[in-house]
Amino acid sequence: MGHGVLDSHRRPKEETLRTMTTELTGVIAEHIAAVNAFDTDAIVATFAADAYVNDNRREIHGVDAIRRWVEQEMVGDRVTLEVREVLDHHGDIIVRARYDGTFDKTNLPDELVMSNYFSIREGKIISLAVIRNQHSPY
């Protein structure tokens, strides 16, 4: 298995993760730029009306709730994102980014890198999951 030979039920890695880059396009590029500009209206405009966000195991549903989350925790805490890696996984986009800001950093690593799992439909974010993953030994 370590030599690239996979059983018939698994796809080779290059088919599963089609693109690995640090370049952003479309609504995700707009979203990250708006976050880094602390622009509440522009951030909210990247989401569909019925979008779903899971931020560190907290569920936020609908554009009104997302606006409150953005105002308080993104813009309010001056969060910035430095993109480290972008992966296209069957049309969903995974963005690994370094997070910084004025939020409480107690018990967090000096360099906080989190994974952002985006699903996009019709040019809008329909779901976003923000997760602080742990390194996998696999």
Task: Write out the residue ranges for each language-model feature.
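Intrinsically disordered, low-complexity peptide-like regions
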Residues: 1, 5-7, 29, 53, ...
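A short gly/proline-enriched turn/hairpin at secondary-structure junctions
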Residues: 50-61, 73-76
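Short, low-complexity N-terminal intrinsically disordered segments enriched in polar/charged residues
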Residues: 2-46, 137
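A beta-strand edge to alpha-helix "cap/lid" segment located at domain peripheries
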Residues: 12-23, 67-138
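Short glycine/serine/threonine-biased micro-segments
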Residues: 36, 60, 99
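Hydrophobic pocket/interface hotspot
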Residues: 31, 43-44, 51, 62, ...
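Structured beta->alpha junctions
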Residues: 32, 58, 85-87
